[in-house]
Amino acid sequence: MRLLLAFMACAAAAATPDWSAADANGRLAGEALSRSRRVMHAWLNLADPVTGLLPRMENNPNWVVRDSAADLYPFMVIASAFLERPVYDGSMHHILRQEMLLTRRAGHLSDDLQPGGKGFVRPELVMDEVMFGSSEYMKDGLLPITEILGETPWYFRMRDIADDMLRLAPYKWRGGRLPAQTAEINGNALQVLARLSWKTRDPRYLDQLIAIADFYFLHQLPATGYLPAHEWDLATDSPRRGVFVFSDHGNEIVGGLTEAVMLTRALRPEKAKQWETPLKKLLDRLLETGRNADGVWVHSVDVATGKVVAPRHAHCWGYMFNAIYTGYLLTGEPRYKQAVEHAMDAVVKNPNYLFDEAGAGRKWGANAYSDSIEGALVLLNRLPHPRLSAALDEAMKKYYARQRDNGIVEYWYGDGNYIRSAMMYAFYKSQGAALAPYDERVRLGAVREGDAVALLVSAGAPWQGVLRFDVARHREHWNMAQNYPRLNEWPEWFTVEPGRLYEVTVNGAEPQRMFGFELRKGLPLSVPGGRQARVEIR
C-alpha cells in the first residue's frame, strides 16, 4: 500500500504543470507579439498616400512585387489578423484592393509600381520579371497567409495568379510548359501548385506540376549528376549557370520536388513511383556535396564537379533540411532523418548558425535571423530538441534588440520577415493558442506534456475575452494527407479536433468535459488586472 501511495504521489507530482515555465514563455511570446504590432504600424505610416501601397525600403519608394508584396505586406496581414482586427478589416484589405487595381499587368500577374500614381517601374512588359515577382508573391506571401488563416481574399488572389501562370508560362520543352528556366521560379511554382492541388484537386494544377517535376526528375537531373542547375538554357539544353545554390534564391526547387512526390503519391501514384529513384539520387547527392564539416549546408556548389563554390554556410539552413526530412517521410531512409538531427546538434554547438554577426548577418541583417529561426521552428515541431530550443531563446534576445524605438527594424522589406519569425516564435511559446481580443498588457504562455497543455494568462490590466486554439491546418486549410515540413508553413502545436473529448480545468475548479467543436468557439475567460488564470486541457 505504501508503495502504491508513493507511486500515486509521484504520478500526481509529474502531472503538475510547470507554471513558472509557462510564465516565462508568456513573457517571451508577449514581447514577440508587441514588437510585431509595432513593426506593422511603423510600415503602415510609410504607405504611399496616392496608391496606398508600401515602399520597398527607405531609399526606394516603389512597390516591388518580389519584395514589398512577397516579404513585407503579407506578414503585416497576419499580424493584424491576430493583433488588431480593425486594421485587418480596413488597411490590409485596402492594400489588397489597390494592389489588384494597380499592379496587374499580364492577366492577374503583378508588376512593380512607382508611388504617386506614376505607373509601372518598367515602361515595357518584361515577362521574366513579372513571372518572377508573381511567383515570389505567391510562394513567400500568399501561401503563408493561407497556411495560417485559411480561405481569405488572399487565397483567391493566389488562385488567380496561379491560373495565369499556367496560361502564360513562356517556355516549352517536350514534356510541357515551364514558367521559367531558373530553379528558383520553377521551385516556387511547384510549391504553389502542390498546395493548390491538395486543396482543390484541380487537374490543371497537378498536370502543370507534373510537367515541371518531369523536367527535373526525368530530364535535367540525369544530365547533371542529380544537382539542379541554377539556370538552364532550353535552346542549348544545357546549364546556363551551372551552380546549385543551397541558400534561398536557388534551393526552392528541392522543396518543390519533394512536395511534388508527396502529392503524387496520394493523387497519382504511378507518377510518384517513376520519381522515386531520381528523388533518392537527388537527396543523396545534396548530402554528399553540400554540407560542411559540421553537417550544415554551404552556400553553393558546382553542378558538374560537386565542388564547393561558396563555402559560407546557408543562413536559411533549415529550408533544405525540410526537404531532407520530407525525403525521410517518403522513403523511410534513416540516414535522412539522421542528417537533420546532426544539423540541429551542430546549430546548438555553434550559435553562428542561428545568426552569424560577422558573416551572413553583415549582409542580410535581421533577415539572416528570420530565415534561421523559421527553419529551426519547423524542424523543432517534428523533432523536439531542448538544447536547440534554448539556443533559439538566446538568439531571439539579439533579434529583438535590432528593432528601433519607432518600430522600424532596418527600413527595408525584410522587416516583414521580422514579424513572421517573431509571431511564429510566439505561437511556439503559446503552443498555437491566442487571446481574442489581443491586449499587449496581457500575456499568454504555455507548456506541453504529451496530449496535455497548460496555459497561463497573466493580466497586467483587466481582460475579458476568449482563448482560441489552433487546428490541424494542413488538413483543414489544404486537405493534405500528411503534415510534412514545407517552406512557409506555420507549425501546428496543440491542435483541437472537433470530435475529440477534452477535460478542461480553469484555476483548479471542477474539470469540464468539452468537445473540440465547443473549444473551437473559444474558451471564455475573465481575468482581473494583476491576476492570472490557469487553464489545463487534456
Positions of PLM-derived features:
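Sec-dependent signal peptide recognition
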Residues: 1-7
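Glycan-recognition and catalytic cores of secretory/periplasmic carbohydrate-active enzymes
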Residues: 14-537
